[in-house]
Amino acid sequence: MDGIVVVDKPADFTSFDVCAKLRGIFETKRIGHAGTLDPMATGVLPVFIGKATKACDILPNGKKAYTASFKLGIKTDTEDIWGEVLKRQESFVSQNEFVAAAKGFLGDIKQIPPMYSAIKINGQKLYSLARKGIEVERPEREAHIYQLDILNFDEKNQSGDIYVICSKGTYIRTLISDIASKLNTIGTMTALRRDASGGFSLSEAFKIDELQRLKEKGELQNALISTDKAFECFESITLDEKRTWLYKNGVMLRADQIGAKDDTYRVYGFNSEFLGLLQTDVKENKTKRIKNFY
């Protein structure tokens, strides 16, 4: 089997755990995922099966959507409720104050990654250093917040929920901590659910036990999404029979042979088979293969 299955990752599972489960269900070792989710987080985890694993590192849609819960007046070493509590303090923030502060983070922002993250500094993952009690300086990283909605805010308990659409690499727990800092208080994330990632959403996601039941009924193929759906943001080109043969035999086509402008394209054979991604250079009359999927 080849394709993409969108998994609704359960809490207490690492992304690797999910892949391990699916290797058993799909009976293949060729499985990978895109967009790691923290163990306590739930939601959309795109998993790639068979030939589709070639797409893991080239997904074009970097936007992600999250629903997160938070509580003000508490600070942990991980910036989420599952870490060690470092500080507690009284917090007196109104809903209007929180909304105003949060809206100030729309657009381009900079974040200092948390120590408990998979980012590498001098070849070492930050969380490995953090577990040894070592804290190192982390350079700021750019991120973009496309949408930030306050779903609710409980002034009495100083807690609430937000919905965020953001760029790849955005840390929601850091965003919550930074909003709290802007309000001269502290805050931590108490829950996280990914609603969308890489163009895939919860509406097309399967729980692991649902996939197991589909396998038992011989309907596992119904859970798979074709690999080319991940690249629908690109225009498509369909080759005739001769050029399909040339393409599949490694011949580099000229840009004028396929009538393309400067862009990245999904390439299909004459029989509608998804062949891969192609980049064109009209000025040089060249094409460059990004990835083959046949």
Predicted stretch roles:
Residues 1-12, 16-33, 37, 41-44, ...:
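Accessory RNA 3′-end/elbow-binding domains used by RNA modification enzymes
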Residues 136-137, 169, 283-288:
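A short local loop/turn or secondary-structure capping micro-motif enriched for an aromatic residue
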